[in-house]
Amino acid sequence: MTVTVEPSITTGPIAGSSKAYREVAGPDGVTLRVPLRRVHLSTGADFDLYDTSGPYTDPNAVIDLAVGLPARPGLVRDRGTQLQRARAGEITAEMAFIAAREGMSAELVRDEVALGRAVIPANHNHPESEPMVIGKAFAVKVNANIGNSAVTSSIAEEVDKMVWATRWGADTIMDLSTGKNIHETREWILRNSPVPVGTVPIYQALEKVKGDPTELTWELYRDTVIEQCEQGVDYMTVHAGVLLRYVPLTAKRVTGIVSRGGSIMAAWCLAHHRESFLYTNFEELCDILARYDVTFSLGDGLRPGSIADANDAAQFAELRTLGELTKIAKAHGVQVMIEGPGHVPMHKIVENVRLEEELCEEAPFYTLGPLATDIAPAYDHITSAIGAAIIAQAGTAMLCYVTPKEHLGLPDRKDVKDGVIAYKIAAHAGDLAKGHPHAQERDNALSQARFEFRWNDQFALSLDPDTAREYHDETLPAEPAKTAHFCSMCGPKFCSMRITRDVRDYAAKHGLDSEEAIEAALEAGMAEKSAEFADHGNRVYLPITQ
């Protein structure tokens, strides 16, 4: 770390909860401490949640960003990749750790990795990372993009964004820096990141040739990849599917090639009128990544950047090539996931998942959104979360977040949180729709707290306790309001849940606690009214008495 940096980061537990650990036995007698966020309910019970925040929410942890986070136990560097070891029937320390995190069996984790339907991004040189899995059999994950640009940001700001994003649930981070101090920025992020870190090596390679794509070479790119592998990057986006013959297919698009990596490689192919060096040297690239157990994230350089271009010939031609490259990577023991679009209207989203599964041997799908409409700049975290929820239900394993600044500028701290929360909603909605084990438990716990007017429990169980409390307290800030049987929306007279509870209390008081009892009460009431009608001479209309 050659650059002096003094980041200011947020630490300490999330409101209403504490950092806790579950100890599980790993291979070779290693004890693994699996992190979780423990919510303390007013009922006296605890509710445990998946936690991505690392030591930053642990009040007992010593945080020194200049030193970095401690290495995880059980790390093995000389036994091959997670894919190779899974195929050999081995349950690694990472698999045991993940099984405890996901509430699944270690055998399931191993089998999904062995089949190529899940990946464990865990570079041997990133021991600070807490193991996680990306695959459709597991909870849908969320990636947060950070990184500087030539125009703005600093190392300190990007480290802060990383800590902030993981606090709110980012499962992985991608450092997409394109400005100054790319190597140093990545080093600070890696040494302090509790989650896997991904990159797009072509960005740094382009910076080395002063931004001229035509000056790129395989040798320069290869050395950049090795440099990043040595640092500890866990997965790399490689746009090896952008072939020379596919570039003309984008000519009539509304928005052309919108992927930075895709446009760089398209420019190189056209300038040299040769096939992409990423494609022609792919097997050598596999050998490099296998040495470090770095996961391929095969990039969708020809993804659609507008609704008009969704599911076109260029997009799916590249996807077919990514399927071919997937087979090659797996043959070299390298883990693979596939990147997906982009901008896709809702009725065309599922086709993307089905085709990816068919062409790419069910390798985990990792999608940017997709945005379901193009008309809402400043709200693209919403337009894309709509598409993200649909594609998650269909089988996408990881969602790359989109922030409100998409298409407008570099996201700041607030944008990062807004993007992460929007995508945690989409991911969880996808898990619910898939019937993922345990997904509904949190919904049930929060709904029960809502019905019982346990306001503090509602806040603590939510994705964003701080904002939930803030919104409630804007109109009812007094502490007694935290136990009140209403909020400022309906007030004490019109709260549907309070009225429902009153009805239930009345029913309980009068023994109406079953369908049979209610039916009997109804019959008795009808009989009473029938007798009353007879007593009045069976007359429909009675004279008015003064």
Curated annotation (Swiss-Prot):
One of its GO terms (cellular component) is cytosol. Zn(2+) binds at H343, H407. Its EC number is 4.1.99.17. Pfam families: ThiC-associated, ThiC_Rad_SAM. Disulfide bonds: none annotated. It catalyses: 5-amino-1-(5-phospho-beta-D-ribosyl)imidazole + S-adenosyl-L-methionine = 4-amino-2-methyl-5-(phosphooxymethyl)pyrimidine + CO + 5'-deoxyadenosine + formate + L-methionine + 3 H(+). GO terms for molecular function: 4 iron, 4 sulfur cluster binding; carbon-carbon lyase activity; zinc ion binding. Keywords: 4Fe-4S, Iron, Iron-sulfur, Lyase, Metal-binding, S-adenosyl-L-methionine, Thiamine biosynthesis, Zinc. GO terms for biological process: thiamine biosynthetic process; thiamine diphosphate biosynthetic process. Signal peptide: none annotated. Substrate binds at N145, M174, Y203, H239, S259, R260, G261, D300, G301, L302, R303, E339, Y366. Catalyzes the synthesis of the hydroxymethylpyrimidine phosphate (HMP-P) moiety of thiamine from aminoimidazole ribotide (AIR) in a radical S-adenosyl-L-methionine (SAM)-dependent reaction. This is Phosphomethylpyrimidine synthase. It comes from Mycobacterium ulcerans (strain Agy99).
